[in-house]
Amino acid sequence: MEHPNVLVFVEFPDPTVPTTGFLKGFKYPDAEVVGFYHLDEGESAETVRDAHGSEFDSELEAIAERFEQEGVRAEYDLVFGQDRFAARRQIIERDAVDAVLLPGASNTLGKVLVATRNVGNAERKASLLDIVDQDELLAIDLVHVADPDDPEGESSGEGILKQTASTLVDVGFPELRIDRTVRTGSDVAFELSQAARGYDLMVLGETERDLGDRIFGPIGEYILDERDVPVLILR
């Protein structure tokens, strides 16, 4: 993945901004910083833009400059709407985004936790090394959540993690820095949020629940809300 395009999605009026220490761990991506403002029923984008547009644009420019200072090319845009999931999906499809970053409070990018659901996305997880600077990483741990009703769930999960770890090693990541854990639980979002304690970044593969499910709520945003850990969703 050469110069992957990362959508950095922040919400106004109080956006969470990636810290300088966190950004130092990124390696050669292009960033698209999008600020989203939720319109209440009856509220118009024109009214909000007239009242706060210049203020929000200045904040977005400052965020983009923070990326630029760390060697990450960045553009920015401000969008309005009543559905942030639909807005995010539209941008992802329009701009062929490779990954989505939901910023959190991490000040470094040394410990990364990668959630792995199946063997099929192992190579996509390995593409993490094209976004995160390997030299900054202290550990890249893998986690799989097994179905408690599946008698072979844990053993299957161990196999998935082993193959994912092998893929990471094949692309140059030191095997000694990789740890593997299988958790068992019916609530995947809860199990992953528990596993994310103490990490600087949580990496997920794309699912409808991460990018737009309004019924159960996106897993990525649940983890961010519970742990304030940044989440990177790989497509």
Each model region followed by its residue ranges:
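Helix-enriched interaction subdomains in cytosolic or periplasmic regions
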Residues: 1-5, 58-103
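Small/aliphatic-rich secondary-structure junction motif
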Residues: 1-47, 111-155, 166-174, 178, ...
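Short, ordered loop/turn segments at secondary-structure junctions
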Residues: 37-41, 79-81, 104-106, 144-148, ...
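N-terminal positively charged helical leader segments and presequences
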Residues: 40-58, 64-69
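Charged helix-capping and loop-helix junction motifs
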Residues: 53, 158-162, 216-220
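Short beta->alpha junction loops
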Residues: 77-82, 179-186
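Gly/Ser-rich helix-loop-strand patches that form or flank binding pockets
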Residues: 81-133, 196-235
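A short, acidic, amphipathic alpha-helical segment used as a generic capping/interface helix at domain edges
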Residues: 164-167, 184-196
